[in-house]
Amino acid sequence: MKVYTKTGDTGTTALFGGTRVPKHHIRIESYGTVDELNSHIGLIRDQNISDLYKNVLIEVQDRLFTVGAILATPPEKETLKNGQPRLQNLGIVESDIEFLENEIDIMEEALPPMTHFVLPGGHTTVSYCHIARCVCRRAERLAVHLNDMEPTDELVIKYLNRLSDYLFVLARKLSHDLNADEVKWIPRK
């Protein structure tokens, strides 16, 4: 299979099921941002961090491919002509969200309680986590916007919301593990 098809040379692309839409369509923005997020998470995984975190991030990347597939499938193409779901055995389930919540809880047990907002930074790896968190929030906003236009799996939105929480806590935990300065934001008076 060739990487290039030339079918997108006029500014359109195909969704799952074959429907062609402009490349600026909210559905493309939505799953394209999830793809961008996945790349940022790969960058975090490539850092010198514990294999425990790397394994969680591999699971997250797998789930993000599923999220992308869901977002790339318009509602009218979710079911094949034979009545079977187009994305059979693919989906986000409550246990995916619970997995993130459990990982958040484990990390938070080892951290001092938050008393202030924290400025992103302190170490390159921590900064990568904050960038991924921001991209995740953008992906979530786009998925919500898409959901306002066409029904979208609500667990996708919930997963992206929880993932941004996970990435924030991971940034704090890595800051702690790396003995990086966690600078509190204290508003000027």
Regions from the PLM with identified roles:
Residues M1-K189:
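Phosphate/pyrophosphate-binding loop motifs in nucleotide- or prenyl diphosphate-using proteins
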